[in-house]
């Protein structure tokens, strides 16, 4: 009986090690996306604000690619009923992986002015300390031109 239990425990251990803990990633134009993420190209309307509504959970949901012009000042805001939804903004024109903005609780708005024409990747993220099945959260991202 002890031998059977040891074999069963060893089998479970091997099976758990072979399953990846996070989603696989793929590179799209120099930006890493999780397999569950869809890249969606968006653009500012001729007048008014750009509003992006969606749902996200760890490694799943839409991420947005926005073309921005040099010298154009934009205010980007995130709203969600969940305190665990944050937003990261990356610049496709910069080779490093650092976000040019990463929101946190109480700081979900930024004002950015690019020095050159570029594209931003806007990624809403649901941050949970432990994975839970089926959990996700709705969000609204608003991009406004500033004077």
PLM regions: where:
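Bacterial N-terminal signal peptides that target proteins for export
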Residues: 1-9
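Acidic, Ser/Thr/Pro-rich low-complexity intrinsically disordered segments
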Residues: 55-127
